[in-house]
């Protein structure tokens, strides 16, 4: 890529990056883990092995495999290995089985922790753009005494989640506000790769609506594409250099770049304001600080691709 380059960094992970994984793993004992290891050894299938290193990833794989092969033992974690059928939206459908995404559940709680907050009993939390519940199902297992909600405009995903993930309040929301929630209802709202798809108009509209439903000093945690994502797609997904250059120039000039990328019929959605977008922190600072305070900005924190932000409602 020609032109000016920015130094693109990724945020280092630490013990704070695995809070949810450690909470769920701590519900197991040595006998539970030995039972799983014995079963996997008897199966002699190289697809189903627990890595020795690093230990945090070993814990995640233990939870995933255990909830699938020994649910009668591992159900004490609160996780379930139920997965949507292939015709239902699920961003983990590349896996043969799963129990939700521990990675993104950890990411959300790490962002809260780094912002000086924790999940509290009896408080309400919303997964905005939950799809079939891949993140919120894990957080519900880790923090069962809190109130968990999920909303998404993809009808089939929400219907599946309602039927298969009890204890979480799912709602099939519209692509335009308002949401069916009260003012100041939530202590925290999180949105994984939702503000990576809005047009600029829709992005601002939804920031205002989410601000309405968050309590004063409550948090919005979200991931979105930034400059780091352009480099990621260029290096890993074969995004043409000319497209990257054009998007990068627009992004550096205006702080926001939107691209139409989806074909008609994409999960029945209205695509007029739904594509791919890239946002710089300068745009966040220039457009949102009347209603929000920026607490955290992590470059490339989500899968070495998307940036993670934490905003506090004023």
Ranges and model annotations:
Residues 187-201:
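A short SAM/SAH-binding and catalytic strip from SAM-dependent methyltransferases
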Residues 127:
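Class I SAM-dependent methyltransferase core
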Residues 179-189:
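A short acidic, Gly/Pro-enriched loop at the edge of an enzyme's catalytic core
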Residues 124, 147, 185-187:
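Structural signature of beta-strand start/N-cap positions in the alpha/beta core
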Residues 5-6:
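Basic polycationic patches enriched in arginine
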Residues 11-121, 131-178, 200-205, 221-314:
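Class I (Rossmann-like) S-adenosyl-L-methionine-dependent methyltransferase catalytic domain
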Residues 204-216:
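A short glycine-rich, Lys/Arg-flanked "PGG" loop and its adjoining helix->strand segment in the class I
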């Amino acid at each position: 890529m020609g032109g000016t380059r920015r130094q693109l960094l990724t945020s280092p992970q630490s013990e704070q990056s695995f809070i949810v994984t450690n909470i769920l793993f701590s519900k197991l004992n040595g006998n539970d883990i030995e039972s799983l290891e014995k079963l996997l050894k008897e199966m002699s299938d190289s697809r189903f092995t627990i890595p020795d290193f690093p230990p945090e990833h070993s814990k995640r794989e233990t939870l995933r495999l255990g909830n699938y092969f020994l649910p009668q033992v591992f159900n004490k974690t609160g996780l379930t290995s139920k997965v949507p059928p292939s015709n239902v939206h699920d961003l983990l459908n590349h896996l043969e089985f799963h129990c939700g995404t521990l990675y993104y559940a950890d990411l959300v709680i790490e962002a809260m922790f780094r912002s000086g907050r924790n999940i509290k009993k009896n408080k309400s939390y919303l997964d905005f753009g939950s799809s079939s519940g891949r993140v919120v199902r894990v957080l519900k297992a880790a923090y069962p005494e809190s109130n968990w909600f999920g909303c998404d405009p993809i009808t089939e995903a929400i219907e599946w989640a309602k039927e298969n993930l009890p204890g979480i309040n799912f709602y099939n929301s519209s692509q335009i506000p308002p949401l069916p929630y009260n003012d100041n209802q939530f202590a925290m709202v999180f949105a994984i790769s939702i503000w990576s798809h809005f047009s600029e108009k829709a992005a601002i509209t939804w920031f205002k609506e989410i601000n309405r439903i968050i309590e004063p000093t409550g948090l919005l945690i979200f991931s979105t594409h930034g400059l780091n994502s352009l480099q990621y797609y260029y290096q890993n997904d074969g995004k043409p250099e000319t497209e990257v250059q054009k998007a990068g120039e627009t992004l550096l000039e205006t702080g926001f770049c939107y691209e139409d990328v989806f074909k008609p019929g994409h999960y029945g959605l209205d695509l007029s304001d739904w594509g791919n977008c890239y946002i710089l922190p300068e745009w966040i600072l220039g457009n949102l600080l009347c209603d929000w305070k920026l607490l955290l900005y992590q470059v490339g924190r989500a899968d070495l691709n998307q940036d993670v932000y934490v905003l506090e409602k004023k």
